[in-house]
Amino acid sequence: MATILGLLISYPLAYFIGVKARRWPILQGLMLTLVIAPFFISFLLRTFAWKQMFANESLIVTTLQSWGVLAPDQYLVGTDFMVIFGLTYNFIPFMTLPLYTSLERLDIRLLEAGSDLYANPAKVFGRVTLPLSMPGIISGTLMTFIPIAGDYVNASSQFLGSSETAMIGNVVEANFLRINDYPSASALSVLLMAAILALVTFYVRRSGTEDLL
């Protein structure tokens, strides 16, 4: 889910930076800097900051409760929403940068040719822009999905999740560090790695970009 959300958010952003903002190099550079800026802050610090911002007694939560968006006994931290939000935010640069690289290389004359042939914007996007940006989509999806599948920080009860939002990474971490059940943890790790490899192989072959492997 976080990977899909990241793609839906990153594609328009990367398209604007890589295609529309070409005429304004300063704006293009500024937006790229903003995309890269989170890398200069620790992953743990970023996640912990979101936990503090959406804590049970935070201004955001109390305001949403007063507006009736949240029930008086309803909170955000420890929910699936916050886990997905954290994953999407933390890994969205890994989706945006490959997309930007593909779209920045896009020849604008191809888009203009499509318009000259009376294709509407939707057809130009579906038949020109989307196919040419497919390598960026594949690369961004893989760079996002693989770390998300094994992530155990965002869903941890110490950060944005709870015991009810545990991901497989949290189960592996608990078996290794708390229960000391090393055989089960090792087996789960191997199963996770095999599942990711199988899904990635299937995804790349179905998309017709085997040369990326």
Where are the regions a protein language model picked out?
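Transmembrane alpha-helices
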Residues: 4, 89-109, 119-151
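Membrane-interfacial helix termini and adjacent extracytoplasmic/periplasmic loops
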Residues: 27, 47-88, 122, 158-164
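Membrane-embedded alpha-helical segments of multi-pass transporters/permeases
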Residues: 7, 11, 15, 44-47, ...
